[in-house]
Amino acid sequence: MIRNNKSMFIKLKDQSSYEMPSGSTAKDLADKLNLKGPHEALGASINGKTVDLSYPLQEGDQVILWGFNDPEGKEIFWHTSAHVLAQAILRLWPDAQPTIGPPIENGFYYDFANLTISDADFEKIEKEMQAIISENFQIKREVISTKSDALKQFQNNPYKCELINSFEDESTLTGYRQGEFYDLCRGPHLFNLGKIKALKLMKTAGAYWRGDSNKEMLTRIYAISFPDRKLLKDYLHQLEEAKKRDHKLLGAKLDLFSLKEEAPGMPFIHPKGLIVWNQLVAYIRECLSRHDYIEIKTPTMMTKELWEISGHWGNYRQNMFISQIEDRDFAIKPMNCPGCMLYYKSHTHSYRELPLRIAEIGNVHRYEPSGSLSGLFRVRSFHQDDAHIFMKPSDIQQEILGVLALADEIYSTFGLSYRLELSTRPEKNTIGTDHEWEVATAGLKGALDEMGKEYRINEGDGAFYGPKIDFHIRDAINRSWQCGTIQLDMALPEKFELEYTFSDGTRQRPVMIHRAIFGSIERFFGILIEHYVGKFPLWLSPSQIRFITVADRHEPYARELAKRFKNAGFHVDVDSTQESVSKKVRNAQLAQFNYILTIGDQEVEHKTANLRTRDNVVHGEIQIDEFIQKLEIEKQQRQSHSPYASAERN
């Protein structure tokens, strides 16, 4: 490759080399590549570090440009939008004191002291934000020389000063300036404000400074912004759809679960909900059996000494429920892992036994502040479909492939697509040697490459004990949920001194994978309620078939049929009330019965039933034996869609 001495070569995401003039910035590269739409560059990663587009490039740099379709791009976009919000608030309420304003999963927020507003102020604030954006300020990053300089610059804001004092003395402090607004911030940010085309304030809330209930209550403003007005319109539509799918409302309406003040954050699963629950557990157990897992059950409460070995007592105690029995400290398990380590140690192991796949559907308890509890999504008591796989280092890639295949099979059954993220070694405070991390990361990456699914790399975002793969599933309205995880753990086998005998007779430390696919079964149940809008496929449904009688004389035949369907393994109900047929049909549809069978004089005479679906697809008279056979196939194959979804299939 020929080059002149005033140019340099950098590497793009696809590892191809690209020639740029010496002294170029990431923005120069973005301008040259001229990416458009959701791929238009908002920021960059250079050698794994996320930076502003103004960042200078050097010979050999590995450069990835982030657009709004990337999580990194959204984070940069929303972080800058938070600064626009703070600037607007200060223009309108000069005595307000900005504290922190981070991007979050959907948009951003900013917390303010000395500010009282209501929803009635939103229009005024949005108008001021639009005015600031129209000024199209270039955003400038400024390095602050010392902590004392930073304290001087923010001397009138005690919240910023508290943050500054919490940093280590050698930390590099930076500020960002747009017009008259200047904020203490590590960045990165947009190059200018012109990229922000649409925004909306969502709500206000109270928030304690730094999340500490002993500190001041601040005013938090939530908002969201987009580089395109249509994206905002689509997002607001998605919010309306999400309201219809709220699992808390549907859970009550369909009598699936409830939450009681007497047990905050600990769900009561009702009979109908337990039918769904049991099907989920039976399904995953079936999958585990086919993939050669064994299953164990470990105690719910174990001694302090165990949690000291695992590190939970020192690092996680504030999130544990602790009790004292006979002068000994016990903790209810917040995780299943330490119990599995004890099970592994209860036997001696040979390399011939490995890989050893051990599953547990364990009930764990974690303290969560009452204000953070939310339906089935954020609870204090939940079940995890955990598994720990013990193996030789040479097994890593093949075992990861096996877990990836298992997860793909399970998510596909529910009609859930997903994306994958590989998180690599953090810069500081990790255990294990460089070689161990290289082998572990190469194993995970090799498995992902072999699987052939697209994935993204989160540089430095792994756990201190090993790299990990996360599954982000997408539901029916395209919301993303982090569910499954595959974590390679180099810490617990060391802490518990786990061993196996190698072929040469030496005792060696196994490599361990921690994996979960549902994650929290309660949370996954909640996701499915919203994904299906309560309309569970037949195999999961707690309300499969309802018989409706036209008159009292039809009840004996309806109950005879109901018994046949129950004997065939279906959940059946008979409505023989005095309501009109149309009202009974409507009630059955609202209760989300998959199939509604009406019995009248003709059906009694012909020994048939009149079929319609919960979506009001009417099929008329059907033969009972044939219908049962079709439903058995639908249930056994765990079909997502009913063969009776359209009238043409009759």
Swiss-Prot record:
The keyword Ligase applies. InterPro entries: aa-tRNA-synt_IIb, aa-tRNA-synth_II, aa-tRNA-synth_II/BPL/LPL, Anticodon-bd, Anticodon-bd_dom_sf, Beta-grasp_dom_sf, TGS, TGS-like. SUPFAM superfamilies: Class II aaRS ABD-related, Class II aaRS and biotin synthetases, TGS-like, ThrRS/AlaRS common domain. GO terms for cellular component: cytoplasm. Binds 1 zinc ion per subunit. GO terms for molecular function: ATP binding; metal ion binding; threonine-tRNA ligase activity; tRNA binding. Its EC number is 6.1.1.3. Zn(2+) binds at residues 337, 388, 514. Residues 5-67 form the TGS domain. It is an enzyme of class 6 (ligase). The keyword Zinc-finger does not apply. One of its GO terms (biological process) is threonyl-tRNA aminoacylation. Keywords: Aminoacyl-tRNA synthetase, ATP-binding, Cytoplasm, Ligase, Metal-binding, Nucleotide-binding, Protein biosynthesis, RNA-binding, tRNA-binding, Zinc. Homodimer. Catalyzes the attachment of threonine to tRNA(Thr) in a two-step reaction: L-threonine is first activated by ATP to form Thr-AMP and then transferred to the acceptor end of tRNA(Thr). Also edits incorrectly charged L-seryl-tRNA(Thr). NCBIfam families: thrS (TIGR00418). This is Threonine--tRNA ligase. It comes from Protochlamydia amoebophila (strain UWE25). The gene is thrS.
